[in-house]
């Protein structure tokens, strides 16, 4: 928000391109953020956005699990209240941290569990793709020096990322 970005959830990756085209059509700068896409889908989205930020995993949960240190996953697993159905499935969630945390994130999708996980990470535990994407967005949205009155207008579509 401080960068002048408006976040819009397209609802699914297939709707990112059409929604981006709508906002570009009214003169907005559009950044697209999404999960790994096939070549055709990625190309279609890229044509409609000013810059595409696509991570290398099929889902955001996969990004967190594959690109966060195991210690961060264990730390978070010890902090959360496990739902009863997952306690039954994973009596010792730490013994299979990848599977248990995937199940947890999947069961809490849309409830802020991924953001909650990231909020307890130190900077070194946050996946590099997230840090690099944030750096690029910040750099792209910095007001031009000498033009303090400039307003940055950008739309970010995060699709199913968060």
Regions found by a protein language model. Give the residues of each.
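Acidic, Mg2+-coordinating catalytic modules of nucleic-acid enzymes
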Residues: 1-162
